[in-house]
Amino acid sequence: MSWQAYVDDHLMCDVGDGNTLASAAIIGHDGSVWAQSANFPQLKPEEVTGIMNDFNEGGFLAPTGLFLGGTKYMVIQGESGAVIGKKGSGGATLKKTGQAIVIGIYDEPMTPGQCNLVVERLGDYLLEQGM
């Protein structure tokens, strides 16, 4: 399966009631884009560095916030292997795997829990596959 198929079929899927993520991507730890949805924001190198720093030392982004394509999200949870950000009625979930970062961005009516489930389910699958 291509990386784009993972984004299209597993991240941008309907989670019920017609709700889908606003955008999604799978990127390498170096920030290279493996696959993304059409409207996923272009990440800046310093944003990827901040994300990787938070995965390596939890809480790194808490004082400054999580930035994705210049948009700031308040970090509400940083747990082992995942970063969750909130912005207004939307937010983002990031899941680190051995080689990649799975990113989902949502807006209402999708809920934070639905976004977390979609992103973490694919992230956990990739971890199980050694990716």
From Swiss-Prot:
Keywords: Actin-binding, Allergen, Cytoplasm, Cytoskeleton. It is found in: Cytoplasm, Cytoskeleton. The keyword Cytoplasm applies. GO terms for molecular function: actin monomer binding. InterPro entries: PFN, PFN_euk, PFN_sf, Profilin_CS. CDD domains: PROF. It comes from the Eukaryota. One of its GO terms (cellular component) is cytoskeleton. Occurs in many kinds of cells as a complex with monomeric actin in a 1:1 ratio. Belongs to the profilin family. Binds to actin and affects the structure of the cytoskeleton. At high concentrations, profilin prevents the polymerization of actin, whereas it enhances it at low concentrations. By binding to PIP2, it inhibits the formation of IP3 and DG. This is Profilin-2. It comes from Parietaria judaica.
